[in-house]
UniProtKB/Swiss-Prot annotation:
PROSITE patterns: UPF0057. GO terms for cellular component: plasma membrane. The chain crosses the membrane at residues 6-26, 29-49. It is found in: Cell membrane. Keywords: Cell membrane, Membrane, Transmembrane, Transmembrane helix. This is UPF0057 membrane protein PA0567. Belongs to the UPF0057 (PMP3) family. InterPro entries: PMP3. It comes from the Bacteria. It holds the Pfam family Pmp3. It is a multi-pass membrane protein.
Length: 52
């Protein structure tokens, strides 16, 4: 299941974070990082998924 979430996080980082933590602070931070740059959003999403 984590592999699927990581693949989703690579394609749509905020969706991967949302599936892991819901509408928390990490989700909104990921939205911001993705808007500022796609790569930081991916790195943050993979970190959140791997951490839990």
């Amino acid at each position: 299941m984590d592999l699927i979430r990581i693949l989703i996080a690579i394609l749509l980082p905020p969706l991967g974070v949302f599936l892991q933590v819901g509408f928390g602070g990490a989700f909104w931070l990921n939205i911001l990082l993705t808007l500022l740059g796609y790569i930081p959003g991916i790195v943050h999403a993979v970190y959140i998924i791997a951490k839990r």
